[in-house]
Amino acid sequence: MLALISILLLFYISQNNLITLLIAIEILLLTVTVKLIYMGSVYDDIYGTIFSIVIIILAGAESAIGLSILVSYYRLRGKVGHTI
């Protein structure tokens, strides 16, 4: 799990396209969510499941807002990229 998070963080830092950065952030959130669900089932705790549902809802809202901002940016500039 830690290796996946590390690889995704490196992918997040090294990319030049904002859409792939949003995808990397979504995969990171889903990795944390899967870990919460697993730990909730191991320790028989309902709070991990409830918190993971909240994370999924927030990730969906973040995706919608991020993609709408990217579409607006693309219409304004004609390209979608960033510099670090």
UniProtKB/Swiss-Prot annotation:
It is found in: Mitochondrion membrane. It catalyses: a ubiquinone + NADH + 5 H(+)(in) = a ubiquinol + NAD(+) + 4 H(+)(out). The keyword NAD applies. GO terms for biological process: ATP synthesis coupled electron transport. Disulfide bonds: none annotated. It holds the Pfam family Oxidored_q2. It is a multi-pass membrane protein. One of its GO terms (cellular component) is mitochondrial membrane. Core subunit of the mitochondrial membrane respiratory chain NADH dehydrogenase (Complex I) that is believed to belong to the minimal assembly required for catalysis. Complex I functions in the transfer of electrons from NADH to the respiratory chain. The immediate electron acceptor for the enzyme is believed to be ubiquinone. This is NADH-ubiquinone oxidoreductase chain 4L. It comes from Candida parapsilosis.
